[in-house]
Swiss-Prot record:
GO terms for cellular component: cytosol. This is Nucleotide-binding protein PMT9312_0481. Belongs to the YajQ family. InterPro entries: DUF520 (IPR007551), UPF0234-like_C (IPR035571), UPF0234_N (IPR035570), YajQ-like_sf (IPR036183). NCBIfam families: PRK05412.1. The keyword Nucleotide-binding applies. CDD domains: YajQ_like (cd11740). Nucleotide-binding protein. PANTHER family: UPF0234 PROTEIN YAJQ (PTHR30476:SF0).
Length: 165
């Protein structure tokens, strides 16, 4: 039997699911009657989604479609950080959606402190953009996972417990 048990806390998403989501969004944009002829373009790079269209109404519709498709593919809506709407090349509008990934240092410290305050026998170490939570008791770790899911709501970032050992 193992001496100590642990898990990692990460803020991550499945990139392929996001690609599939945006493929579905593009397909729906090309098929929906109210979005045909709007010259709407949805692009994805390493850490951003770019939406370019000709009206704010169309932009809001595309954002709604992205949210609906992301929910169906089990992507957290907390990964999307909507930027300002910019006017580009005359009458076009562009919005950049930043994709949140990784736990920032100050948020990691808050999570670590709240776990340590609740559970004295649990050790938390910060490893870059992840946290390693370890303890001799599986029950304490399961309670820590519940606490992390509660913290997820207040911190507004998607958190997952991985590598439970």
């Amino acid at each position: 039997m193992a001496e100590s048990f642990s898990f990692d806390v990460v803020s991550d998403f499945e990139r392929q699911e996001l690609v599939n989501t945006l493929d579905q969004v593009k397909r729906e944009i090309s098929q929906r009657y109210d979005l045909k002829g709007t010259d709407t373009v949805v692009d994805l790079d390493k850490e951003n989604i770019f939406i370019t269209t000709n009206s704010e109404l169309t932009l809001n519709s595309v954002n709604d479609i992205i949210r609906q498709k992301a929910i169906k593919r089990n992507l957290s809506l907390k990964i999307f950080d909507y930027g300002e709407i910019e006017t580009v090349s005359g009458n076009k509008l562009k919005q950049t959606i930043l994709l949140k990934q990784g736990i920032k240092q100050e948020i990691a410290k808050k999570i670590s402190k709240s776990i340590r305050d609740q559970f004295k026998k649990i050790n938390v170490s910060i490893n870059g953009e992840t946290l390693r939570v370890s303890s001799k008791s599986k029950n304490d770790l399961q309670l820590a996972i519940k606490l992390i899911s509660q913290l997820e709501e207040s911190l507004n970032i998607p958190l997952k417990a991985n590598n439970f050992r």
